[in-house]
């Protein structure tokens, strides 16, 4: 998906989260309103979210985390890469895809998500019954860097076991290194 977690300016200096951002005082946020570019500081106080900036910011302005891009020989680190790398993967698939549908959505972080609507449309229009989602996970105690792609067996949702088994079989037949991911939160 192409949308990003962040914040919407409410009243005075109040912020409302978009998606589920981790809010820590001192994080730098960026955006732009009718008066120009914004680079402000996030302030969290007992669950209340505010910004610190030299002037008021227009209501409804979206603020996102300032990028802090880092690259080494083994890692690339920056906010929002999960979404952007998923898009890159889909574009690479598009180079050779025949008789398929690739979707770029932009409503996932705002609550509800667009996937149920898109899935219904794709099924009704073309009869497509199965889909893969290209998302980028994080390193956890069960998903290790460099050990292969993560096949999500469950997150907040539980996909059909027969479908997971089919994907695992395809990965094995193709010689793709993979790991099995089991999480209790998040959702693809």
For each feature predicted by the language model, list its residue ranges:
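N-terminal hydrophobic/helix-forming segments and targeting peptides
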Residues: 2-188
């Amino acid at each position: 998906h192409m949308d990003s977690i962040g914040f919407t300016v409410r009243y005075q200096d109040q912020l409302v989260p978009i998606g589920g951002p981790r809010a820590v005082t001192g994080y730098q946020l960026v955006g732009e309103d009718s008066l120009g570019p914004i680079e402000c500081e996030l302030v969290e106080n007992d669950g209340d979210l505010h910004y610190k900036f030299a002037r008021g910011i227009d209501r409804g302005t979206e603020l996102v985390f300032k990028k802090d891009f880092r690259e080494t020989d083994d890692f690339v680190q920056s906010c929002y890469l999960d979404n952007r790398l998923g898009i890159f993967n889909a574009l690479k698939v598009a180079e050779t895809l025949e008789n398929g549908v690739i979707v770029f959505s932009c409503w996932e972080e705002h609550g509800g998500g667009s996937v149920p609507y898109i899935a219904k449309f794709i099924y009704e229009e073309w009869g497509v019954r199965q889909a893969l989602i290209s998302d980028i996970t994080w390193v956890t105690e069960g998903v290790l860097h460099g050990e292969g792609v993560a096949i999500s067996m469950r997150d907040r949702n539980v996909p059909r076991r027969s479908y997971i088994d089919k994907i695992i079989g395809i990965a094995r037949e193709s010689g793709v290194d993979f790991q099995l991911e089991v999480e209790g939160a998040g959702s693809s």
